[in-house]
């Protein structure tokens, strides 16, 4: 057989393989991407407390222990709004509901938190909900404890390393086996935003919290954070918040930053994120979902338009 004939046979074979591959692809019906859906349900309104309708709480510790949703502590104005002279009340109450049972109702548990607290951070762990920092009307705390649910009974595990400084209104997220915490304030008497950035290695918790280089931006409290991939590495993302000082200075922030633990470095994000005091959730491979937040500071009044419900 001549070389020319061999080449023609090989060429025809390649064309046949290409045709078969193309035909196979065209014969497979296109698949519809799996989309995540959000369904809102307002049936989980908190139960009456002390024979009064529950107006809800802000800044509570919350999370799931198995199928049980836990809400603990928090603060509210039970008697009057703040612009009408109402005083803020801090709570140590713990609520629990099993979300898998259609007839399940909220329980106000007989056990309570070690003290009335709000505006700390909650991290869901396999063993329970880790509660970090927080404040009451007079001071901020560096307490760290875990709410556990054992045989239907609440157990408070205080065998956790305290924060290096008291902090409230910080933001924290779990990234792998490490908890990252950023910002917040150290005092209620003289509230001022900080640039603290701490990490706790859950595999070496006896070493306590370690301070890391902070982001290249302004101090902040009421910020939003989450962990998500940047396309290469799992990273800690920090968004928005507000900068405030003892002299009354206050500024709403819309910037964002990403911390890469592998590189031990920060990078400023180009976009604007007006999500102060909102929530952020990782979704998909490398997306982040923002829930609510405050795009600008508006004085409290009966005519307040309410907070942002944008997602």
PLM feature segments, named:
Residues 1-30:
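Bacterial Sec-dependent N-terminal signal peptides
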